[in-house]
Amino acid sequence: MKKKVISLLAGLVFAVNAHAEDNALASKSVHWYIKAKVITEDIDALKAVISELVEITKTETGVTNYEFYLSENNMLYVFERYLNSDAGAVHGANVGETEAMKNIFSMLEPKEFVLFGGPYEGPWGGYIKSQGISPKLIGGFNR
C-alpha cells in the first residue's frame, strides 16, 4: 500500500488533467485528502519537515489549501486544494524531488488517498479509476 500511494503521489503531477463536467467548478479545482499513520517517534522532526513543505508551497499562487492535521492517535491528515490541474502540477514539480518530500515519506505509513476534481486522463488515470480513489461529483457546489 505504501509503495502504491507514494508512486501515485509522485505520478499525480501527470494525472491531474481535468475534463469539463456538468459542474464547471469541479472540472477546474483539484484537491486531495491523504491519511497516514505517523511511524516516527520524533514528532518535532515531522513538524520541521512539514514546515519546509509549507514554506515551499506558500510561494505557489494556485494553492488554496495546504493543511496538515495530527490526531491524538498519531494519524496525519493532509488536505490540499489547487485552483486547477496546472496548479497541482506546479506543486508536484516544486516539492516532488525535495529532501523534505523524501523525508516525510520515511516518517509515515500511508493509509488512504482520495483525489477529488476528476475524472483524469494520462498515465495515472486508469489506475486512479480502477482503485476507486477519485469519486465523481454527484451534487453540491463550491464557492
Give the role of each language-model region.
Residues 100-104:
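Amphipathic alpha-helical coiled-coil segments
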Residues 2-8:
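Sec-dependent signal peptide recognition
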Residues 19-65, 69-76, 83-93, 106-143:
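Short S/T/G/P-rich N-terminal loop/turn motif that feeds into the first structured element of a domain
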Residues 10-18:
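Hydrophobic h-region of N-terminal signal peptides that target proteins for export
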